[in-house]
Each structure stands twice: as C-alpha cells, then as structure tokens.
UniProtKB/Swiss-Prot annotation:
Protein's UniProt name: Large ribosomal subunit protein uL3
Record organism: Streptococcus suis (strain 05ZYH33)
Renumbered residue ranges of the record's region Disordered: 124-145
Keyword rRNA-binding: yes
Protein's UniProt keywords contain Ribosomal protein: yes
Assembly notes: Part of the 50S ribosomal subunit. Forms a cluster with proteins L14 and L19.
Function: One of the primary rRNA binding proteins, it binds directly near the 3'-end of the 23S rRNA, where it nucleates assembly of the 50S subunit.
C-alpha cells in the first residue's frame, strides 16, 4: 500500500551509525497531516485521499475553505495535496511520521531553488568555447539551427530563468523517524530551500 505525508524542509545534518558509518541526512519536519476528503471513483471519477498540512489563521481563509475543513473538524490548512493508491483512511484521521519506518524507500518531491536568469553553460551544461585572445566565441549559446526553416525551433536550449521547478528524487532511504519531534531523516539531499514544502511518498520503482 502506498504511504504519503507532507512536510517542511528544515535543513541538512549528519549522523553516525553504530558501526561508525557517516551518513548525510536531510531533516524533514512533518507535523500530523489531516485527511480532508476521501475521493472515490463513483463520486469524483478517481480514487484519492486529500490531506492538509500546516495550520493557517482563520482570518486568512474564506468561507468555502473553512467549510471544507470543518468536515474534518480541523483548522484551515496552508497546503492541500492528494495521494493516490492509499486505502483505509477516513475524513478527520491524522497521518503522522510513524507511518514510515527506518529502511523505507521513498520518492521525495519539492520545488528546486530559483537561480534567476542563467546562461546555457550553467542552465543546460553546454561546453564553452576557447578562452584564447583570438577566439570570438566564449559562453554564447551557439548555432540556432539550420537556415532552411527560417526560425528557431521550440525547445531550443537557450538562456533563461533557472530553477523553481517541481523536482522528484526517487528511491531515497528513510534513515530514522523521531515521532516525539515529528521529524523524518532522509539519506542524502532533497530538492528545495529551507522551510519549503516537501512531499514524501512510497517509492514507485522500489526494488526495480
């Protein structure tokens, strides 16, 4: 069965195993998520569980939002997301970090850090030209393509805004779960800046 939870990236640290192995980990704070709605094929056309994370002040919420969370007897939420292939949950039920255990393999989704306007070398990994004095080609994007179409094809790798994209890293290992602090430690790094929203769910390709 698929498991999922929403959390907030705290930062990175390091831990040591009993054998002395050094492991870099990312700390994810995941306060209890509340099930706001259970969607079914009969009523909504697809099956999913809608969960809310991070309480929001009521003064910042409109009446439809307040009415929606009232069914789950909880406060308005800043983030609302859906998970598919999750069964056995009811409206108002809480999802805690204890859903996961050390050794679980998960997929982690976040929004990558924004880098601003960048050139093709940093943005797309292209090679630069000779830096010699006689060269007139250093860090330019290069050819725009053949002459015949009289235009530049869509998708051409050019300079532009870099980062700020939805990124998923697959098959990361849960190193430790700390229920009393609502914290999950995940091996390696995960996308996003500190305090950004992180989605953790069971790995799709685990064991493949």
């Amino acid at each position: 069965m698929t498991k999922g939870i929403l959390g907030k990236k705290v930062g990175m640290t390091q831990i040591f195993t009993e054998s002395g192995e050094f492991i870099p980990v990312t700390v994810i704070e995941a306060t209890p998520n509340v099930v706001l709605q259970v969607k079914t094929v009969e009523t909504d056309g697809y099956a999913a569980v809608q969960v809310g994370f991070d309480d929001k002040r009521e003064v910042l919420s409109n009446k439809p939002a307040k009415g929606h969370v009232a069914k789950a007897n909880t406060a308005p939420k800043r983030f609302i997301r859906e998970f598919k292939n999750i069964e056995g949950l009811e409206v108002g039920q809480e999802i805690t970090v204890e859903t996961f255990a050390a050794g679980d393999v998960v997929d982690v989704t976040g929004t990558s850090k924004g880098k601003g306007f960048q050139g093709v070398i940093k943005r797309h990994g292209q090679s630069r030209g000779p830096m010699a004095h006689g060269s007139r080609y250093h860090r330019r994007p290069g050819s725009m393509g053949p002459v015949a179409p009289n235009r530049v094809f869509k998708g051409k790798n050019l300079a532009g805004r870099m980062g700020g994209n939805r990124v998923t890293i697959q098959n990361l290992e849960v190193v430790q779960v700390v229920p009393e602090k609502n914290v999950i430690l995940i091996k390696g790094n995960v996308p996003g800046a500190k305090k950004s929203l992180i989605t953790i769910k069971s790995a799709v390709k685990a064991g493949k």
